[in-house]
Regions:
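C-terminal subdomains that position terminal phosphate/3'-OH groups for nucleotidyl transfer/ligation
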Residues: 176-281
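Alpha-helical phosphate/pyrophosphate-handling elements in metalloenzyme active cores
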Residues: 12-43
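Acidic (Asp/Glu-rich) catalytic motifs at the cytosolic membrane interface
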Residues: 50
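Active-site alpha-helix of zinc metalloproteases
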Residues: 46-47
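Sequence-structural signature of the catalytic-core scaffold of metal-dependent phosphohydrolases
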Residues: 1-3, 24, 28-31, 35-36, ...
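Active-site flanking loop/helix segments enriched in acidic
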Residues: 1-21, 116
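Alpha-helix N-cap/helix-initiation motif
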Residues: 15-19, 55, 75, 121, ...
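Single conserved hydrophobic/aromatic residue that forms the stacking wall/gate
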Residues: 283-293
């Protein structure tokens, strides 16, 4: 994950987050949430470390490029590919492929593959990871956008959550330079979300009083922000989508990245012998199956 970008490609510089740094941040935050809610910290950490492992290079731009390459015979989903990695591609044991992960880890990842088809909510530990993921990227995409000069704090102050953060920081500190102010705002964004999620989730857990993990699966979504914070997050995410993720410069980088990845796909499709030897045996299967994979 260390060489894989999240939103920004490396063309803007090295001082922004990658999939690895994002994953580490999600895992740390998820453990904090799970500890406060008295959930299974080890399971939460495993799910957090797994949640983005299936992403190709260039983030969602790469995922879209591979998905287009596989049409009309199949599709590419980073959540599905994560399962392929841990069940088929990894070779850690002599008797079988994969990592021999627990049922709870695999079940939780499966619920990420097609969220629209869920017949029940995922385990509370998986809900914690989803909440930590959302909390982390809202704060850190904001941070990266400012550092890369795609947005200013003045522009971001149009958003309710950023205005709240600036007001809180300015009431506590004076004479901060730009770097200190940005870092303090990001720190507030993280603390504000974590505190809200813990308060809302703890209240829901007391109300539902689940007696088993099965009851939690078939209950309501429990680990979540309050309605007020969710509205603020959606406002900020919409702003980031329009002003950052759809920024003309990023769209150009996205297209260049997709062109490179699709060219590589076509070359490997024409020359499968270029694959590392350990993967060649997976290619020598029936043509329809290979095309779908």
């Amino acid at each position: 994950l260390s060489g894989k970008m999240q939103v920004f490609t490396g063309e803007r510089g090295d001082y922004h987050r990658t999939r690895l740094t994002h994953t580490q941040e999600v895992a740390s935050l998820a453990r904090t949430l799970s500890r406060a809610l008295r959930l299974n910290e080890d399971l939460v950490e495993a799910l957090a470390l797994l949640h983005d492992i299936g992403h190709p290079p260039f983030g969602h731009a790469g995922e879209d490029a591979l998905d287009e390459c596989l049409q009309p015979d199949g599709q590419f989903s980073h959540n599905q590919y994560a399962l392929t990695i841990v069940e088929d591609l990894e070779e850690r044991y002599p008797g079988f492929p994969g990592l021999n992960l627990s049922y709870e880890v695999l079940e939780s990842q499966i619920t990420r593959v097609d969220k629209t088809a869920r017949s029940h909510y995922p385990l509370l530990e998986a809900q914690v990871v989803d909440a930590a993921d959302s909390t982390t990227y809202d704060a850190h995409d904001t941070d990266d956008a400012i550092k890369l000069e795609l947005l200013t704090l003045d522009e971001l102050s149009e958003m309710s959550l950023i205005r709240e953060a600036l007001a809180a920081v300015n009431s506590e500190f004076t004479n901060l330079d730009a770097t200190q102010l940005r870092a303090s705002v990001v720190h507030y964004l993280l603390n504000r979300q974590v505190s809200d999620i813990l308060a809302t989730s703890a209240e829901d857990l007391l109300r539902y009083d689940f007696q088993s993990s099965d009851e939690a699966r078939h209950g309501e979504l429990v680990v979540r922000p309050s309605k007020e914070l969710q509205e603020q997050k959606e406002e900020l995410e919409g702003f980031l989508y329009e002003r950052v993720y759809r920024h003309p410069e990023l769209l150009k980088m996205r297209q260049r990245a997709q062109d490179r990845l699709q060219a590589m796909f076509l070359k490997y499709q024409t020359h499968p012998e270029w694959f590392p030897k350990k993967y060649l045996s997976l290619i020598h299967i029936s043509e329809p199956t290979r095309r779908k994979r």
